[in-house]
Amino acid sequence: MAKKSMKNRELKRQLTVAKYAKKRAELKAIIVDLNASPEARWEATVALQKQPRDASAARMRNRCRITGRPHGVYRKFGLGRNKLREAAMRGDVPGLVKASW
């Protein structure tokens, strides 16, 4: 189990990313736009750098919804490998069966 502080930190990051997503997208569009003046592109770059670090989606970490485990998380299910296996063995995941060949 992950510490509560780590789970809360991730939640805070998700909220920060959501808060700044629109503004970041606008600034990135200006930076990539070749028709924009160099000054405008530079100002957009500086404004993007002044935003909080946690506003970047790249800093978010996928965690297991049950345990908070950061590694071995399946995106499709949102569960860590251990909890996914337990759920599959109980039959809680429709369509998921244990491999056999």
Curated annotation (Swiss-Prot):
GO molecular function, one term: rRNA binding
GO cellular component, one term: cytoplasm
Keyword Cell membrane assigned: no
GO BP term, example: translation
Classification via InterPro entries: Ribosomal_uS14 (IPR001209), Ribosomal_uS14_bac/plastid (IPR023036)
Swiss-Prot/TrEMBL keywords: Ribonucleoprotein, Ribosomal protein, RNA-binding, rRNA-binding
Pfam families (alphabetical): Ribosomal_S14
Quaternary data: Part of the 30S ribosomal subunit. Contacts proteins S3 and S10.
Family recorded in the similarity comment: Belongs to the universal ribosomal protein uS14 family.
Function of the protein: Binds 16S rRNA, required for the assembly of 30S particles and may also be responsible for determining the conformation of the 16S rRNA at the A site.
Stored PANTHER family: 30S RIBOSOMAL PROTEIN S14, SMALL RIBOSOMAL SUBUNIT PROTEIN US14M
Record's protein name: Small ribosomal subunit protein uS14
